[in-house]
C-alpha cells in the first residue's frame, strides 16, 4: 500500500515516533530534486525538536545542491510572506496547535501552501532512488526575515493608530513571541503579554488559541485580547467584557466591516463544513453568501481563489484575508479586527453579540482498527437526526489519530445527548 505522509496541513506526527530526522532528511532530498539549484527558506516554532528536524531537512536540501536560508523562530505566515517576496520555496517546522511532543513539516511556494499534486510528487520521490548531485548547497542565516515581515505588516496597517488602546496577547509560548508584541507596540498600543516563553516544552500548554479561556480569565476588563496558536496562523479574540470571540464571529465582524468599506469581493465568504449555522444566517441577512468546503485552510484558500472571494476561514481561528495575505495570519487578522472595530465605532462585545452562535459540540473518538465510519447504526442515526434539523459532521482528523463528531442545533441539551450517543456507537 502506498505510504501517505502529508495530511491536511503538511506532515504531522510525534517526534521520534511517526516523525523522525530520517523522514525530514528524505523530505529535504525530495524537495531538493524538485527545486534544483535554487534556495529554500526554513522557519520553525519553539518546539525542542525543531532544531533537530531543521538540521536533517537542511542536510537533505543542501545534499541536492539547494541553498538553505535559516529564518529561526518565525510564524508560518511570516515564512509564507517571505517566500512570496523572494519568489522561492519555504518549509515551516511546526505542529501548529498540537502539544509539544508533536512536530510537523509544511512546504510553501511563492506565498502559498503547495497543492496536493506537489505533495504527492514529493512522496513519490521519497519512496524512490534519489538523483546524485555533485554540487552542495550552503546554509545561511536569514534572521533579517523577521524584520522584513514586521515591516510588511506595518506597511499594510500604516493607517491604524492604536494609541490609547490596551491590548492583551497570549502568545502560546510559540512563534508569535518574535513578532506580535513588537507590531502592536509600533502601532501605539499598550501591550500586556502572557505565555511568551520560547521554552519548546510549553508551547500550547493550557494556553493560546486552543485554550482562549486562559486569556479571558487572566486579562483585565476593558482590554481587547488575542490568543494565537503555536505557529501564529490562528487567532481567537477576547472582548472587553472578557468573552471569547471565536473564528466564526471574527469572520462575521470582518465581513461586516469589509462590506461597508467596499472591500468584500463577490459578496461571498468561504467557510467549512464546521462553520456555525449562526454565522451563515447572519451573513445571509446581509446579502452575503457562505460557501462551505472541507476542513482545512488550504481548501478554504482553493475555494477563495476559485470564487474570487477575499475573506474566508475556520471557527478555529484560521482566517484568510486575501488582499492582505496568502495564508491564515493570526497577527494580520487581529489587526484587521482592531481596524474594523475602530472604523465601526462599536465595542467588540457589541459586534460579537450580533452574530448568533448555535449550540455546537465536538467529540473526539480515538481511532482504532475497529473504528469504522461505515457503521450502519451510525449512518441511520445521522440520517434521522439530520431530518430533525440537527447538523452532523463525522470526519477523521487530518492532524491527529482521532475521529471528530460535531453536532449542531438549537437545543443545547439535545445536541449534547446526540453527540454522546454517536460517540458511544463509534467507539464500539
UniProtKB/Swiss-Prot annotation:
Keyword Mitochondrion assigned: no
Keyword tags: Isomerase, Magnesium, Metal-binding, Phosphoprotein
Enzyme class: isomerase
Phosphoserine modification, residue list: 96
Enzyme Commission number, as recorded: 5.4.2.10
Cofactor: Mg(2+)
Highest taxon in the source lineage: Bacteria
Modification(s) after translation: Activated by phosphorylation.
Active site per UniProt: 96 (phosphoserine intermediate)
Any Pfam family the entry gives: PGM_PMM_I
SUPFAM superfamilies: Phosphoglucomutase, C-terminal domain (SSF55957), Phosphoglucomutase, first 3 domains (SSF53738)
InterPro entries given in the database record: A-D-PHexomutase_a/b/a-I, A-D-PHexomutase_a/b/a-I/II/III, A-D-PHexomutase_a/b/a-II, A-D-PHexomutase_a/b/a-III, A-D-PHexomutase_C, A-D-PHexomutase_C_sf, A-D-PHexomutase_CS, Alpha-D-phosphohexomutase_SF
GO cellular component, one term: cytosol
Catalytic activity: alpha-D-glucosamine 1-phosphate = D-glucosamine 6-phosphate
Coiled-coil region(s): none
Family per record: Belongs to the phosphohexose mutase family.
Full protein name: Phosphoglucosamine mutase
Amino acid at each position: 500500500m502506498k505510504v501517505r505522509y502529508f495530511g491536511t496541513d503538511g506532515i504531522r506526527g510525534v517526534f521520534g515516533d511517526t516523525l523522525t530526522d530520517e523522514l525530514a532528511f528524505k523530505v529535504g532530498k525530495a524537495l531538493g530534486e524538485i527545486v534544483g539549484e535554487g534556495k529554500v527558506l526554513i522557519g520553525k516554532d519553539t518546539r525542542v525538536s525543531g532544531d533537530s528536524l531543521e538540521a536533517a531537512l537542511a542536510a537533505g536540501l543542501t545534499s541536492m545542491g539547494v541553498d538553505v536560508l535559516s529564518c529561526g523562530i518565525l510564524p508560518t505566515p511570516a515564512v509564507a510572506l517571505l517566500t512570496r517576496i523572494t519568489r522561492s520555496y519555504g518549509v515551516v517546522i511546526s505542529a501548529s496547535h498540537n502539544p509539544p511532543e508533536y512536530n510537523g513539516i509544511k512546504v510553501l511556494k511563492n506565498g502559498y501552501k503547495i497543492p496536493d499534486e506537489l505533495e504527492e510528487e514529493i512522496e513519490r520521490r521519497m519512496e524512490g532512488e534519489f538523483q546524485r548531485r555533485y554540487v552542495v548547497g550552503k546554509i545561511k542565516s536569514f534572521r533579517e526575515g523577521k524584520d522584513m515581515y514586521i515591516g510588511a505588516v506595518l506597511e499594510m496597517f500604516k493607517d491604524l493608530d492604536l494609541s490609547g488602546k490596551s491590548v492583551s496577547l497570549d502568545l502560546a509560548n510559540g512563534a508569535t513571541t518574535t513578532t506580535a508584541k513588537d507590531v502592536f507596540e509600533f502601532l501605539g498600543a499598550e501591550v500586556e503579554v502572557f505565555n511568551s516563553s520560547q521554552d519548546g516544552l510549553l508551547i500550547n500548554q493550557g494556553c493560546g488559541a486552543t485554550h482562549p479561556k486562559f486569556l479571558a480569565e487572566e486579562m483585565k476588563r476593558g482590554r481587547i485580547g488575542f490568543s494565537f496558536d503555536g505557529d501564529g496562523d490562528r487567532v481567537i479574540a477576547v472582548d472587553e467584557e472578557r468573552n471569547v470571540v471565536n473564528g466564526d464571529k471574527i469572520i462575521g465582524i470582518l465581513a461586516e466591516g469589509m462590506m461597508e468599506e467596499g472591500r468584500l469581493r463577490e459578496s461571498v465568504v468561504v467557510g467549512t463544513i464546521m462553520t456555525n449555522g449562526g454565522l451563515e444566517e447572519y451573513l445571509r441577512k446581509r446579502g452575503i453568501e457562505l460557501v462551505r468546503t472541507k476542513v482545512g485552510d488550504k481548501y478554504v484558500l482553493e475555494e477563495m481563489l476559485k470564487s474570487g472571494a477575499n475573506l474566508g476561514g475556520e471557527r478555529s481561528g484560521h482566517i484568510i484575508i486575501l488582499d492582505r495575505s496568502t495564508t491564515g495570519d493570526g497577527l494580520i487578522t487581529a489587526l484587521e479586527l482592531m481596524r474594523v472595530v475602530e472604523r465601526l465605532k462599536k465595542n467588540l462585545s457589541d459586534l460579537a453579540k450580533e452574530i448568533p452562535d448555535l449550540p455546537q459540540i465536538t467529540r473526539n473518538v480515538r481511532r482504532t482498527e475497529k473504528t469504522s465510519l461505515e457503521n450502519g447504526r451510525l449512518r441511520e442515526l445521522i440520517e434521522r437526526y439530520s431530518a430533525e434539523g440537527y447538523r452532523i459532521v463525522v470526519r477523521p482528523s487530518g492532524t491527529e489519530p482521532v475521529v471528530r463528531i460535531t453536532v449542531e442545533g438549537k437545543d443545547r441539551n439535545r445536541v449534547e445527548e446526540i453527540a454522546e450517543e454517536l460517540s458511544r456507537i463509534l467507539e464500539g
